[in-house]
UniProtKB/Swiss-Prot annotation:
The active site is at C137, H277, N297. It comes from Rattus norvegicus (Rat). This is Cathepsin S. GO terms for biological process: adaptive immune response; antigen processing and presentation of exogenous peptide antigen via MHC class II; antigen processing and presentation of peptide antigen; basement membrane disassembly; bone resorption; cellular response to thyroid hormone stimulus; collagen catabolic process; metanephros development. Residues 1-17 form the signal peptide. Highest levels occur in the ileum followed by spleen, brain, thyroid, ovary and uterus. Low levels are found in the liver, kidney, jejunum and lung with lowest levels in the heart. GO terms for molecular function: collagen binding; cysteine-type endopeptidase activity; cysteine-type peptidase activity; fibronectin binding; laminin binding; peptidase activity; proteoglycan binding; serine-type endopeptidase activity. Residues 18-112 form a propeptide. The keyword Zinc does not apply. Induction: By thyroid-stimulating hormone. Glycans are attached at N100, N110.
Length: 330
């Protein structure tokens, strides 16, 4: 398997040349990920991107083995995509301007919070979803937060319809653009006004379609949403510990280190606070002495650690994870 670790060869023009020794691994990856490139030019482009990502993985993990990184990366179903393509297909967070607040969390400074929380252990988190090539991250983040509240309120864990939000919260009053992007609080406002169907009655299609909301299939509603103080990780910790899963926006969906993340605590110094992706914080803790947020993504089980990523906590609001946080109340 030494061949797999060989980095790509750089041509004079800076492009990465295909390595024939990787032919078998490329074919194996395509078969595993069910990739079929009918156009030879497309095949060649994808192969070069894949080799570039493979080289990044090998170099990063070599540095990780020397203690230079707190996380490892690995090849996954996005291995033949560029960072720009990943954010174009799967990001699309649209922060409202101005950012309106329907309520804010009042911190209890004297409250003792647990050292770690994982709402999955309490049955408040549904299975990991796959948004596909639709910028609906915001919808999955919002529905995930409400699913947790619904479980805490009724004792029932129900998958809610992200497609309902994609199709129906696009009116001017909400400002969401379906697969073109949106924001979690606007989704909450739609649910306050209308309610939301279940995933079973309104399944996900990964594309913009006509609104088919049916009140007969209503699975949940909420009375208001709460927004946390901007950039306050302590407030986020308190909300996650005492209220449930929290919707957040992050930057880094467009970084190779993020979409190829595999394990450990993600901490990339190049991460900014330029929001481009909506996710769900379902817990927090400490791993090997490094504090983290436990984050549920909507990129399927092949992303990260079975669909989850641990992101650095108490690290100057790393990736802006505490900048735009909210959760609904039933």
């Amino acid at each position: 398997m030494a061949v797999l670790g060989a980095p790509g060869v750089l041509c004079d023009n800076g492009a990465t040349a295909e390595r024939p020794t990787l032919d078998h691994h490329w074919d194996l990856w395509k078969k595993t990920r069910m990739r079929r490139n009918t156009d030879q030019n497309e095949e060649d482009v994808r192969r070069l991107i894949w080799e570039k990502n493979l080289k990044f993985i090998m170099l990063h993990n070599l540095e990780h083995s020397m203690g230079m990184h707190s996380y490892s990366v690995g090849m996954n179903h996005m291995g033949d995509m560029t960072p720009e393509e990943v954010i174009g297909y799967m990001g699309s967070l649209r922060i409202p301007r101005p950012w309106n607040r329907s309520g804010t969390l009042k911190s209890s400074s004297n409250q003792t919070l647990p050292d770690s929380v994982d709402w999955r252990e309490k049955g408040c988190v549904t299975n990991v979803k796959y948004q596909g090539s639709c910028g609906s991250c915001w919808a999955f983040s919002a529905e995930g937060a409400l699913e947790g509240q619904l479980k805490l309120k009724t004792g029932k864990l129900v998958s809610l319809s992200a497609q309902n939000l994609v199709d129906c919260s696009t009116e001017e009053k909400y400002g969401n653009k379906g697969c073109g992007g949106g924001f979690m609080t606007e989704a909450f406002q739609y649910i306050i006004d209308t309610s939301i169907d279940s995933e079973a009655s309104y399944p996900y299609k990964a594309m913009d379609e006509k609104c088919l909301y049916d009140p007969k299939n209503r699975a949940a509603t909420c009375s208001r949403y709460i927004e946390l103080p901007f950039g306050d990780e302590e407030a986020l910790k308190e909300a996650v510990a005492t209220k449930g899963p929290v919707s957040v926006g992050i930057d880094d969906a467009s970084h190779s280190s993020f979409f190829l993340y595999q394990s450990g605590v993600y901490d990339d110094p190049s991460c900014t606070e330029n929001m481009n992706h909506g996710v769900l914080v379902v817990g927090y803790g400490t791993l090997d002495g490094k504090d983290y947020w436990l984050v549920k993504n909507s990129w399927g089980l092949h992303f990260g650690d079975q669909g989850y990523i641990r992101m650095a906590r108490n690290n100057k609001n790393h990736c802006g994870i505490a900048s735009y946080c909210s959760y609904p109340e039933i």
